[in-house]
Curated annotation (Swiss-Prot):
<keyword id="KW-0602">Photosynthesis</keyword>
<dbReference type="GO" id="GO:0045158">
    <property type="term" value="F:electron transporter, transferring electrons within cytochrome b6/f complex of photosystem II activity"/>
</dbReference>
<dbReference type="InterPro" id="IPR036099">
    <property type="entry name" value="Cyt_6/f_cplx_su5_sf"/>
</dbReference>
<dbReference type="GO" id="GO:0009535">
    <property type="term" value="C:chloroplast thylakoid membrane"/>
</dbReference>
<dbReference type="Pfam" id="PF02529">
    <property type="entry name" value="PetG"/>
</dbReference>
<keyword id="KW-0812">Transmembrane</keyword>
<dbReference type="GO" id="GO:0009512">
    <property type="term" value="C:cytochrome b6f complex"/>
</dbReference>
<comment type="similarity">
    <text>Belongs to the PetG family.</text>
</comment>
<keyword id="KW-0249">Electron transport</keyword>
<protein>
    <recommendedName>
        <fullName>Cytochrome b6-f complex subunit 5</fullName>
    </recommendedName>
</protein>
<keyword id="KW-0472">Membrane</keyword>
<comment type="subunit">
    <text>The 4 large subunits of the cytochrome b6-f complex are cytochrome b6, subunit IV (17 kDa polypeptide, PetD), cytochrome f and the Rieske protein, while the 4 small subunits are PetG, PetL, PetM and PetN. The complex functions as a dimer.</text>
</comment>
<comment type="function">
    <text>Component of the cytochrome b6-f complex, which mediates electron transfer between photosystem II (PSII) and photosystem I (PSI), cyclic electron flow around PSI, and state transitions. PetG is required for either the stability or assembly of the cytochrome b6-f complex.</text>
</comment>
<keyword id="KW-0934">Plastid</keyword>
<keyword id="KW-0793">Thylakoid</keyword>
<keyword id="KW-0150">Chloroplast</keyword>
<feature type="transmembrane region" description="Helical">
    <location>
        <begin position="5"/>
        <end position="25"/>
    </location>
</feature>
Length: 37
């Protein structure tokens, strides 16, 4: 049952990781826009 538990953790972490990368990229993009202005 350990494999199922780890699989559940991975499935739970993937959306969080993608969301974190998206937010970080968005903040860097906004910060770049402000620097250009």
């Amino acid at each position: 049952m350990v494999e199922v538990f780890l699989f559940g953790i991975v499935l739970g972490l993937i959306p969080i990781t993608l969301a974190g990368l998206f937010v970080t990229a968005y903040l860097q993009y906004r910060r770049g826009d402000q620097l250009d202005l």
